[in-house]
Amino acid sequence: MAQKMKIVYVDMDNVLVNFQSGIDSITEEERESFKDDLDDVPVIFSKMKPVEGAIEAYQELTRHFEVYILSTAPWNNPSAWPDKLLWVKKYLGGLAYKRLILSHNKHLD
């Protein structure tokens, strides 16, 4: 019988996704308007790029572990949830998309 792989949870923000790249892509007006809550800028998550080396590191982890992506999204940004889902599809593909968990509880065991 094959040994079951251990489960690993990986965060998105500043682990897989370079949050700063999204901030760098918004206008000055948006920065000022959302200065206290930049993650509430509409479609900001769709503008983010991967952290350098993160895609390769994720792929390496999938060779040794059952990898799930565990992230949260702000309640006040209705585009954040679908944008995170589309980001995973775009950069990590089908299996990762099926292993994405969006929750406000990031302390899952």
Task: Identify the function of each model-found stretch.
Residues 1-48:
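Active-site neighborhood of HAD-like aspartate-dependent phosphohydrolases
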Residues 49, 54-88:
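Substrate-recognition element of Asp-dependent hydrolases with the DxDx(T/V) motif
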Residues 3-5, 64, 97:
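A general structural motif
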Residues 10, 48, 70-72, 103-104:
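Short His-Asn-centered micro-motif
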Residues 86-101:
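Structural recognition of alpha->loop->beta junctions
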